[in-house]
Design a protein with these regions (language model features):
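GST-like fold's C-terminal all-alpha helical module
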Residues: 1-62, 67-153, 159-164
């Protein structure tokens, strides 16, 4: 999936890295940068992902210029595929974690890809979901509609309207 995406665009949402790239990079460095087993698998299945991590490591600064962004109407199909994948594991995990955090539970469990998943509750993940919702609520109505429709098309709208 990422191999196909990085074949069409150098970063997650356009031609320059955004905060989403740096956030994703943080996770990917653990899988590709430190663990030799998963790095070997990544090199075999998605060498562009390995190259992307190496490129991201060498970037510095954050450019607020948005002229390089792809409009939501012009996102490549690979972006939809990535978000569809997120809807299966990441979204239910974020929602279950947030509920558990609000209820003071030490762990949470939910079904992910028809399997029960249990994990320790992480306050930071609950805060991340709150930030996603706060940023969405800051959008004007036209942009809210576009973003919500994109998320709904990919199954990720539950991030905004989860059962909490």
């Amino acid at each position: 999936m990422l191999e196909n995406h990085f074949e069409t665009t150098p970063f997650l949402l356009g031609n320059k890295p955004l905060s989403s790239d740096f956030a994703f990079y943080g996770q990917m460095t653990q899988l590709i940068g430190f663990d030799p087993t998963s790095r070997e698998i990544a090199l075999e299945l998605s060498p562009r992902s390995v190259a992307w991590v190496d490129i991201m490591e060498d970037l510095s600064g954050f450019n607020e210029d948005s002229s390089h962004l792809l409009s939501i109407e012009n996102l490549p199909e690979t972006t939809f595929s990535i978000f569809e994948e997120l809807s299966h594991g990441y979204v239910p995990a974020m929602i279950a974690n947030s509920i558990a955090f609000k209820e003071g539970q030490e762990t949470w469990s939910t079904k992910i890809d028809d399997q029960m998943w249990e994990q320790k509750t992480f306050p930071y993940q609950a805060k991340c979901l709150e930030w996603i919702r706060d940023e969405f609520n800051e959008l004007d109505q036209d942009d809210k509609t576009k973003v919500f429709n994109f998320l709904k098309e990919t199954g990720c709208e539950k991030l905004l309207i989860g059962k909490e």
